């Protein structure tokens, strides 16, 4: 007896029964939702073939259904199939509705797309809105289907790369590259794609853990660049020839590019004040998990002006103009976070925003020769030169990063990037060296109620234990502590480098009761209308000073230095106060020279600043890494998310001169939608104290700060992020 014939498996992917060409329809139960969608797809193809149609050459309704079924697939086979049929949709002609095997049957019952493990069921999308398709049909009757699905010729290359890179990024929990990306067709010119979402989702995972998923969407306006070239520009001080003010030195060299940078690296892009209130009141720790962003619904328009007086502007949709998109996944280009310049995407989801121009520093030699070190009354020699030939690093996006070309209706996705960062505490510490360990034993306790009746201590020379002085005086000032909480650092010190003077950075800490802001690293924020300014009616910019909550600051004016060996009497020779000269030099103060940073130093991380603060930063490529960054609380151990660049491609006229650096161009601009998802994990606070704690809230007096005025003006106030106290020891 002959053995039973084996069922044809075709070229199915490993782990699947139906996902792949050439398999039979009786392989048993599908292995997962993607495999089930493939089984329905194969059955539809079988009906096409029996009706005399060729579904392999044409893009069919079955292909479109498979794309929708696998839109949220998490398995590799579902993603590969999803992107394969999207590429087919872009390049193959479409079967008419009468060719569908379902047209002669009963009307199909509408079902929601198949749910994939780990994905949310998508909400209902409205029917596609055709913006230009009707006009295109009138002008090109038989070719409208092909034109509406037009896409870059690189789609077949980029879609598989995007799928593969996204898979590798999903499996790489240690960060690494900036994620893979690629452009893809949107199903036709004028077809609405994507969604607008600015919600923040809090998913409670149990055991005190929370997953925070922040969604952000913005309408971005992009004009064509003023020029198509790269320009090396020297910048000198604005007051040339005037007596030099070294703290106002601005001289540098920068490379100006024709590209724009889309930067979402600021807390205000992702959270609103209510979100931040919930986070700061209930979370004690937070960490970055993943980040992805997308460009979609691209619209490109041209502007022509009539010869009349005054001229009339005419706006036309340009279906052939291109938007250039580049993602620096390997961080090849200079890293330029926009938050310190207040040039990120805007903080208000209902307002259109714009990207900032991409530029970076270039090496230069700065010559600044003050005539005297005792005053600023004389003129300072001011000059700048091109840097040494061994230091020049000129980068262009065109030869450093792959570039995708998008047309009207197209979209681009970066893929998922996974962070590798240290968790950030959302609590503040109140303990200083004076409050670490066991307090001294009291000699007597008060018997009368009231803080004005204190306890007493034994005589200083009768207390037991060990301390840091050679005499017998054991006081709270001389008691030994396990470590140095915070540290004293020189401030208002301007170091001088090859590029010119710069103020040494200080890790921001809270003030002492003496309100010494600058010695404790206070940060001054200045912002415009997109980032917190109340209205544009006033030319005065909005400003505020930020001081963290953690109480490890210093009061330099109260510091002193005792002579050795220690004398208990405060004689003139025994105590060095800030007003005392050092080495006979006038105006040289003790607090400017003392630095107590060392191996015993314990300090808190940089605090997050809502809304204007930067979220993550790139690690410096040095052998010895800094412990903290002043600009951002999260420092990526590997490459940070890749920078996203956009630029309108040159829209040239027939008047072209190859010997000219500038060519006549058709005035072109673009509006497109940007959206992103930033994911965190957080720990909820536990109530283990008796007393209630301070919370971020509103009052009848300040609620007006969070609502618009009668002309639509609204202000973004800075909010503290570390209200919950914690003990260090």
UniProtKB/Swiss-Prot annotation:
Database matches in Pfam families: Parvo_coat (PF00740), Phospholip_A2_4 (PF08398)
Cellular compartment(s): Virion; Host nucleus
Positions of the UniProt region annotated as Disordered: 1-38, 94-129, 163-186, 437-465
UniProt key word Iron-sulfur: no
Signal peptide: none
Ranges annotated as biased composition (Basic residues): 112-128
UniProt: Mg(2+) binding residues: 330
UniProt xrefs under InterPro entries: Capsid/spike_ssDNA_virus, Parvovirus_coat, Phospholipase_A2-like, VP1/VP2
Keywords (A to Z) from UniProt: Capsid protein, Clathrin-mediated endocytosis of virus by host, Cytoplasmic inwards viral transport, Host nucleus, Host-virus interaction, Magnesium, Metal-binding, Microtubular inwards viral transport, T=1 icosahedral capsid protein, Viral attachment to host cell, Viral penetration into host cytoplasm, Viral penetration into host nucleus, Viral penetration via permeabilization of host membrane, Virion, Virus endocytosis by host, Virus entry into host cell
Motif Nuclear localization signal, residue numbers: 4-12
Bias kind Polar residues: ranges: 24-34, 98-107
Segments for region (Phospholipase A2-like): 18-63
Ranges in a coiled coil: none
Composition bias type Gly residues, residue spans: 173-186
One Gene Ontology molecular-function label: structural molecule activity
Domain comment (free text): The N-terminus of VP1 is sequestered within the mature capsid. It contains a phospholipase A2-like region and putative nuclear localization signals.
Family membership: Belongs to the parvoviridae capsid protein family.
Function: Capsid protein self-assembles to form an icosahedral capsid with a T=1 symmetry, about 22 nm in diameter, and consisting of 60 copies of two size variants of the capsid proteins, VP1 and VP2, which differ by the presence of an N-terminal extension in the minor protein VP1. The capsid encapsulates the genomic ssDNA. Capsid proteins are responsible for the attachment to host cell receptors. This attachment induces virion internalization predominantly through clathrin-dependent endocytosis.
More details: The capsids of autonomous parvoviruses expose a proportion of VP2 N-terminus and part of that sequence can be cleaved of to form VP3.
Name by which UniProt lists this protein: Capsid protein VP1
Organism: Porcine parvovirus (strain 90HS)
């Amino acid at each position: 007896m002959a053995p039973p014939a084996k069922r044809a498996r075709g070229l199915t992917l490993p782990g699947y029964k139906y996902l792949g060409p050439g398999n039979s329809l009786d392989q048993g139960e599908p292995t997962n939702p993607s495999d089930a969608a493939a089984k329905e797809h194969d059955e539809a193809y079988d009906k096409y073939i029996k009706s005399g149609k060729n579904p392999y050459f044409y893009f069919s309704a079955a292909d479109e259904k498979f794309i929708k079924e696998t839109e949220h697939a998490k398995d590799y086979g579902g993603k590969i199939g999803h992107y394969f049929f999207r590429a087919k949709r872009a390049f193959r002609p479409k079967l008419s509705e009468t060719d569908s095997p379902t047209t002669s049957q009963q009307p199909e019952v509408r079902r929601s797309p198949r749910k994939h493990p780990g994905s949310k069921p998508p909400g209902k999308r409205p029917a596609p809105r055709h913006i230009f398709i009707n006009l295109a049909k009138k002008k090109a009757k038989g070719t409208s289907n092909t034109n509406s699905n037009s896409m870059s010729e690189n789609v077949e290359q980029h879609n598989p790369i995007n799928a593969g890179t996204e898979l590798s990024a999903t499996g790489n929990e240690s960060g690494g590259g900036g994620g893979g990306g690629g452009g893809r067709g949107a199903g036709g010119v004028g077809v609405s794609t994507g969604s607008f979402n600015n919600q923040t989702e809090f998913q409670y995972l149990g055991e005190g853990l929370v997953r925070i998923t922040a969604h952000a969407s913005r309408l971005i306006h992009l004009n064509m660049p003023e020029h198509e070239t790269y320009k090396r520009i020297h910048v000198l001080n604005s007051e040339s020839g005037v007596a030099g003010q070294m703290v106002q030195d601005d001289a540098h060299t920068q490379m100006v590019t024709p590209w724009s940078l889309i930067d979402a690296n600021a807390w205000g892009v992702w959270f609103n004040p209510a979100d931040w209130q919930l986070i700061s009141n209930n979370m004690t720790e937070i960490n970055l998990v993943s980040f992805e962003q997308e460009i979609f619904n691209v619209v490109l328009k041209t502007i022509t002006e009539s010869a009349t007086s005054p001229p009339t502007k005419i706006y036309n949709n340009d279906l052939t103009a291109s938007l250039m998109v580049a993602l620096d996944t390997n961080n090849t280009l200079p890293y330029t976070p926009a938050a310190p310049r207040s040039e990120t995407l805007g903080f208000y989801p209902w307002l259109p925003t714009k990207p900032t121009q991409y530029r970076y520093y270039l090496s230069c030699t700065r010559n600044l020769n003050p005539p005297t070190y005792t005053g600023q009354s004389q003129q300072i020699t001011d000059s700048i030169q091109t840097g040494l030939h061994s230091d020049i690093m000129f980068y262009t996006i065109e030869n450093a990063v792959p570039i995708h070309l998008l047309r009207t209706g197209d979209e681009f996705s970066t893929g998922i990037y996974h962070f590798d960062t240290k968790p950030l505490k959302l609590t503040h510490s109140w303990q200083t060296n004076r409050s670490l360990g066991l307090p001294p034993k009291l000699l007597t306790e008060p018997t009368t109620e009231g803080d004005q009746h204190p306890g007493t201590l034994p005589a200083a020379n009768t207390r037991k234990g060990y301390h840091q002085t050679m005499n017998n005086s054991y006081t709270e000032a001389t008691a030994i502590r396990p470590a140095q909480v915070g540290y004293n650092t020189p401030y208002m010190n301007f170091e001088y480098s090859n590029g010119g003077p710069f103020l040494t950075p200080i890790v921001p800490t809270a003030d002492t009761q003496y309100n010494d802001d600058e010695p404790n690293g206070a940060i001054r924020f200045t912002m415009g209308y997109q980032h917190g300014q109340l209205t544009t009616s006033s030319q005065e910019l909005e400003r505020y000073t930020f001081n963290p909550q953690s109480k490890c600051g210093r009061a330099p004016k109260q510091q002193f230095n005792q002579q050795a060996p220690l004398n208990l009497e405060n004689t003139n020779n025994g105590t060095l106060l800030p007003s005392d000269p050092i080495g006979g030099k006038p105006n040289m103060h003790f607090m400017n020279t003392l630095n107590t940073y060392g191996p015993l130093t314990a300090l808190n991380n940089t605090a997050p600043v809502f809304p204007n603060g930067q979220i993550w930063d790139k690690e410096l490529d040095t052998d010895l890494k800094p412990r903290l960054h002043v600009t951002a609380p999260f420092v990526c151990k590997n490459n940070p998310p890749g920078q996203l660049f956009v630029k309108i491609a040159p829209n040239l006229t027939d008047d072209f001169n190859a010997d000219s650096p500038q060519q006549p161009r058709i005035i072109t601009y673009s509006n497109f939608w940007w959206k992103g998802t930033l994911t965190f994990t957080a720990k909820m606070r536990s109530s283990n104290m008796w007393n209630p704690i301070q919370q971020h809230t509103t009052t009848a007096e300040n609620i007006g700060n969070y609502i618009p005025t009668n002309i639509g003006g609204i202000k973004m106030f800075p909010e503290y992020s570390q209200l919950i106290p914690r003990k260090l020891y």
